[in-house]
Amino acid sequence: MKKITATLLTLLLSTAFLPAQGLLPYQDTSLSPTRRANDLLRRLTLEEKVGLMMDQSQPVERLGIKPYQWWNEALHGVARNGVATMFPQAIGLAATFDDELVEQCFDIASTEARVKNRLAREKSNDNIRRYQGLTFWTPNVNIFRDPRWGRGQETYGEDPYLTSRMGVAVVKGLQGPDGNKTHACAKHYAVHSGPEWNRHVFNADNVAPRDLWETYLPAFKALVTEAHVKEVMCAYNRYENEPCCGSSRLLTQILRNEWGFDGLVTSDCWAINDFYTPGLHHTEPDTIHADAKAVWSGTDLECGGSYIALPEAVNLGLITEDRIDQSVFRLLKARFELGEMDPSTPYDTIPASVIACEAHKLVSLQAAREGIVLLKNAPSADGRKAPLLPLNPKQTIAVVGPNANDSVMLWGNYNGTPDRTVTILDGIHSYVKPGKLIYEQGSDCAFETSYSSLMAVGKHNGKPGWSATYFNTPDFSGPVAATAQYTTNLRLYTFGATAFAAGVNLENFSAQFATTVQFEKDQELEFTLQMLGTFGQLYVNGEMVKELKGRVGDKEPMYRLLCKAGKPYELELRFSTGSGQCACMFDMGHTTTFDDDALLRRIAKADVVVFVGGISPRLEGEEMPVSVEGFKGGDRTDIQLPRVQRELIAKIHKAGKRIVYVNCSGSAISLVPEAEHCDAMLQVFYPGQLGGQAVAETLFGDNNPSGRLPITIYKDTLQLPSFLDYRMKGRTYRYMEQKPQFCFGHGLSYTTFAYGDAHIEPATLLEDGTMSEERLVIPVTNTGLRAGDEVVQLYVQRPDDKEGPVKTLRAFRRINLLPGETKEVELPLDDDTFAWFDTHTGRMMSLSGRYNLLYGPSSADDVLKCIEVTRP
């Protein structure tokens, strides 16, 4: 009888929470994500739990758990997942000093992401691929402490406060009002900002406590405590001898215990491998110990496959299953919050037509406009001519430079795929009358020669370029699945479930690309192919001349062909792939050697030269195989403009031309000689798909520039401390004692502004019984002849703190003023405004004492006004 009673009790308990409709608690959408996660967790075996702890989360079919892909990217729009709206690169968004606009950009990104996720689930029966999930590993809120860092373009600049405000805006836009539209991720935690070439071995062990709390951690804290970010990514490097993904101090003591973070922590991709790999961190003897160390320290999810050894770590007593349960609970709770486990969500009603729609692209255009920084706009040296900008479209204008007609440069890195891109040359074309525009590339960004594509010179089926014929079989058989025409180099891939063309499979397909070329003079052609697939074959007049197989990343020509004058050549590329992801990057062209003297002759009639230079994401970025003068592994070794451009600009100046220099880069470039040779200068960063239109609007006066530098532009590399030194002394505007070329916060306008004397408005008792915050009220007047935006900036200085920052940004506000209009700008003065490092507690806190409130249009001392205050 006792046995029957016990059995009955067990049955009753097991069904106590079973809804009437027969669903198990974790399947009941009316229950909270916490309750559902706890219920599902108790039903999983250890092996099933571990299968959920890697970025390619495994299904548990007996419980209805679908596979899930945690890794997704949205640095400046949905990335790696087909066509989407592309915004300016993150550093360009920071230059807007407009956190409301940035939030709008990422609200758009999360809207498009929800649609893409729904379409992917419907098409794949819930078996989505990488880059189709709802968890986005952005924003990057590392501090851009050194302009040599190639990934600095992914950040929001060198200032902790600006980075915090932009990062909070990104998280709010991605996560939405309910916090679960998509999930954002604050990365890379912590003390991480290059170099790229040693990030798997580097140990940040020379960081002063005040640098940690005043510089490296504030943005992460803001995203956790204010924006309630759902994920945090731990970095590759070591901090104080421990890999960041194995640092209990960072992940448990600070992140969870002090800041109250209750989301999940993911590793950077394959970072756990660095724990046990000889020659890298090698802090653990093997995978098993590395896995246990990472999870014990607080890394819930691994991007990679090392965690597969966790069951053995449990068996050896290196970690408990209870500790693994804590991590798996967080993962399950996040998936329930997103509705990823449910048959439908409210976001499923968003129509597919919103993807890359015109309204979204207009926001991208506005972000590009607001992020353009006017560095210089001076009258001629003799004073006889007015400032060069805005340009007169009736003039004869020569457009020169390696970035003028480069669409890919505009995209930055970690980019999506726009439906169209407007290059800077395209934008200028739209303003200048026919016959008044001269275009010459003139130089490469960094190399002595340049590769010029000739994909458009041939014809096939009566159309220019290359004709493509696709088959949904790997052997070119069966009906034609799709056709297409290409006049630019092929950049085709299936990453993120992006088909080569509509109607073409993602796997097991083939393609034929064909054209016929004929030249008036002898012409050598170079063919390049980077591929991932079964094979790529090049045919000339029906004969196969070269075959590549598997994965090929070599950028050297696969084949050279000398075409005789007047003779037609039938060219064909055949590409085939089986299962798995694939890529086909193909180009046909020739290497160009530049002739500066010939260029000067061709632009002799130009009234003005617009030189579009700088560098590109092909030279700076994440752990890149780049080896050229001034660059190393994605980073830079010299911050000057590359020599080939510097010399050409000097020659154009010597020829007597007035020059507008447009600098495209994700980092600060020293422009000392260029400032002497050029009458006007713009910094446009990597301005996104419509960046060319925004630049042209600015050049011709339809957009009044209002961007501000989120970085310092140094005079030369000699002004920088060692790249490997993470101490802030001498770095950025906050600690720099020398005078830079252009200061943080700098940006000119086509109008002028005047700042009146500010006053402090004290806190008052409100009708609801609460106290208003104390405010600094600053009168600002547009003293010019046209409307424009001004970015009002407040810096705080603690004169009695000789070891702290010289000054540090604590508030800003973008305003629009009509000619003659005055507005009173109110900036909050709260505890955070006066938060300073306290040497006694080792933490940030509002300290008593003397402060200087410095307000004005930039961080330059000569434009700032001051109010002295004393805090009790």
What are the language-model segments listed below?
Residues 866:
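Short, structured beta-strand-loop surface elements
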Residues 1-23:
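Bacterial Sec-dependent N-terminal signal peptides
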Residues 3, 860-863:
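Short glycine/proline-enriched turn or capping motifs at secondary-structure junctions
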Residues 20-836, 845-861, 870:
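Glycoside hydrolase catalytic-domain context in secreted enzymes
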Residues 839-840:
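Flexible, membrane-facing loop/turn or short amphipathic-helix motifs
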